Amino acid sequence: MIDTRRWRKPLRINIAALVLCLCLTACSIRQTGGSLPDESTDTTEESELSGELIDDTGESEPVPTETPGKPGVTAETSTESFTEPPAETSTEEMTEPEPTEPPLTDAQVALIEEADRLAAGYDYDAAMALIQTHEGFAEVSAMTEALVRYENRKAATVKWESIEEITHVFYHSLIVDPVLAFDGDEDEYNYNRVMTTVEEFKKIMQEMYDRGYVLVSIHDIAHIEVQADGSEVMVPGEIRLPEGKIPYVLSVDDPSYYHYMEGDGFASRLVIDEMGNVVCEYIQPDGTVVYGDFDVMPLVDRFVEAHPDASYRGAKGILALTGYHGVLGYRTDPAYQNHQGLDAGQQAWLAAHPEFDYEKEIEEAKRVAEALKASGWEFASHSYGHRNYRDISMHDLMWDSNTWRNTVASIIGETDILIYAYGADINGTSPYTAENERFMYLKEMGFDYFCNVDANRYFVQLGDNYLRQGRRNLDGIRMWQAISGQKDWLSDLFDAGEVFDPERPTPVR
């Protein structure tokens, strides 16, 4: 009897080899158009899907394949082997890739950001002009897109048709600490009537902004044009704003920080900080000196920084200055140097400051004034001695006006704006004429804009060679009148009940 166990494994190997040979032969015949003989059939399974042979152990082995077009040369069964070669393409049919624009430089980014800020403040022409100062701006897509954007926004603005319907609001120096201001002394009464607290001012600014109010310069309302014959004519300006925006003028009376206000919770002067910003110096009750946004000027500056659309072309407001205690908190009046005609407040201040340097005081005041003007503020005369120009003699009016020019304009620069002390207009509400001696003298002194006090929403009078505008006091007495039911003069601007500082003594009389 034959022992078949010793043949089993070699037989299996031979069958696998036979099948492999048959497969190779079949491939060769197919390429030459032949056919397989009948004996090619075998009990060995061939996977039609995988291209693998399965031997009788159940294990699969890859089927070698030939490279297409090259009989007898085997290749891996990767799909990459069967990828069609790319079609030939002539150089005429190939297109050049479009050049990629380089990223913006830091300088270009800064330029566009500054132009965007100008446009946010409605100065579209200045924004476009700034972009066009960049060499090659037309090749920078971000810049050309900005120009289109500014042009479209400019086209969407509308002209404010009636300059007679532009309101003017004003404040005095703001109360920083109501506890000190309303301490029951002799000054509390006036502080409560005619002053506004810092917190009230912040709320008023925000609510007016929310209602669409935009700061404008009084020079935007109207301006002087010199005619061919040399005569001057005041002509209306053109204010263009987006639909729904409302222009208004702001002014501040007496930011000179008088001696009587010392220790009563007000700032003591304006200074320039390390960033070049105008801020307030404030002396706390313990004598500690701190700096910050404690009055109208720095508060408006910060507000406009955060909301560029709150200001038309950078306008801020008008600072109405006297001169008898100096300007902006600096003791610049000649009396501080020559010690002539000193009042009690001046004497006490000089005694407390033996290191006082008059020339340095003048220099610092000029620096602050220039910084204010550069940031959009304008100056006005408020008379030298806070005098009533309607009631004083013509002689005294002339002396006061000349003294203001010599002691104040010499520091802050010339101005064409006069804001009457006490709101006392030289001619009531009647138009100015050449027969009015006071008006003609003030015109000779260079004044073209004249502002009184008027509680009504609007008082704007365009004369042949002047502009008059009434100003509305946003202070304790007006707010109290509104919330106590007497008369609400302020409802078009803000809700007095939401603004009124609870630390104020009431009633406000």
Task: Give the location of each predicted region.
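C-terminal active-site subregion of NodB/CE4 polysaccharide deacetylases
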Residues: 119, 125-221, 234-251, 259-262, ...
